[in-house]
């Protein structure tokens, strides 16, 4: 079983809060989210817990990353600085990226990198659909953040 949440879900729904983190101030403490993921896994029996981590610089500019707890190990994605065109669909794109990477047989680190890259790219597109190709996601996840159109 897999749990996908954002940095506020565990606190708002289950009362599990990350230590030394101020979501509204854009402060994310990785150690605190390790504890949140472990508590969710222990309490509900999840094998994997994925948590997106948004750090607000402004309403339109954020730092975006995520962590994946998988069988007692923790994996953190790289952090992207992104200008937001539309947030709608960003979480769905993260979940879709996580599922796609799992179905492709990716290892946990590559899985979380792929999911975050898919979501990051979606934030740059207006509307609810992520209109990027799997190749574009792979390139960004693999380190190509040049922003050059690859079509």
Residue ranges of model-derived segments:
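Conserved phosphate/ATP/ADP-binding segment of small-molecule kinases
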Residues: 1-72
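Short charge-dense sequence patches
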Residues: 48-50, 88-92, 151
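Short linear functional motifs in flexible/disordered or boundary regions
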Residues: 15, 22, 52, 61, ...
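…primarily DNA-binding HTH/wHTH and HhH modules…
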Residues: 143, 147-151
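Conserved post-catalytic alpha-helical subdomain immediately downstream of the catalytic base
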Residues: 74-144
